[in-house]
Amino acid sequence: MDSTGQDNSSSPNPPVPAAQAVPTFGDRVHDFEAHLPTLNQALSSIASFVPGFAGYKTSEDRRIADKQLRAVIGERLSKVKDRLDRVVDSLSRAGTLDGLALVDQSGRRLERLIDRMRFADYGYAAVFDRVQMGDAELARIYQYDAAIMGELGKFEDAMIEVEQGTTDGAHLRSALVKLDALTAEFDRRFEGRKHLFDGLPTP
């Protein structure tokens, strides 16, 4: 205490919080896998989109299940393409030629995606048949495929906008941009399936 009567003794420093450990790559992988659905949950999720889904447990099942998955996707997208073809017919009959070429371009992009669903890439199929997958890997691809299937409803929503835009050129162009973006993104996501097998052992 000084001559003024004030206590100049230093107050204790506030406690320093302990430094938080930076999670390692292994910690992050463990956290990701901890949030994966169980194998049965993941299988049920995709089976809700693909009736009679065989699953990917064995090589024979994989060939069947992959074909089932592609068939359902192709069928859903073909229905969207049929609606797009009817829009082309409607514009042609009405003599509305401004948007006709754009609709036709969108249809051809969608047709290429449908063809890809119908015909599996040989190199991808060979890897898919042979790669060894445990329950965690199976759950991961089931979850991924279920997410892909969940995107198909967006195509149907986009087609409603296209159909509503047939009398408004600006609306039609905007709707087609959205449809084209969906087509490109779905193609990219489906292409990404093959990377789920990167680093997995083969016999």
Regions found by a protein language model. Give the residues of each.
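Structured alpha-helical bundle/scaffold domains in large eukaryotic membrane-trafficking regulators
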Residues: 62, 92, 122-125, 191-194, ...
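Leu/Val/Ala/Ile-rich N-terminal alpha-helices, chiefly Sec-type signal peptides and the beginnings
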Residues: 2-5, 14-88, 92
